Amino acid sequence: MPKRVQIVLNEDILSLGMDGDLVEVAPGYARNFLLPFGKAVPLTPAVMKQVEHRRAKEAERQAALKQEAVDFKTALSTIGRFTVKKQTGEDNVLFGTVTNGDVAEAIETATKKEIDRRDIVVPEIHRTGKYTVTVKLHSEVTAEINLEVVGY
């Protein structure tokens, strides 16, 4: 009996791997838990071909997402500057601060494309003026945008 068997996971298993991963486990773990509950399948040439096909599809999808992020970065740079209006007091000091939600709203208004506010890094802004904000569009693509904060 082999000390380890190779299997392909059908779902994410916290201590083992993600869906589609090729892993080596103890034969008893595979035979008594993973295989009977449909959480994995034994590695065969046909299954290996399916895994390679799935990986190629995923790589293609990731490349398309990256290209979309690069295109959006270009669109952001052509717009140039985004404006956020906030209530101000004396000496152009803001009541409150400019949040990443405010910046996301300004971007959505200008581009008509929704962006997650958690992907926006805003420096501490307590006065009116011009600032640089970082937007993470993809794991490999970030954009620097110019933000103008004006008072009313």
From Swiss-Prot:
Q: Which residues form the signal peptide?
A: none
Q: List the disulfide bonds.
A: none
Q: Name one Pfam family in it.
A: Ribosomal_L9_C
Report the PROSITE patterns cross-referenced here: RIBOSOMAL_L9
One BP term from GO = translation
Recorded GO molecular functions are: rRNA binding; structural constituent of ribosome
Q: Sorted alphabetically, which HAMAP family does this protein's record hold? A: Ribosomal_bL9
Task: Summarize the protein's role.
Answer: Binds to the 23S rRNA.
- Put simply, this protein is called Large ribosomal subunit protein bL9
Gene that encodes it = rplI
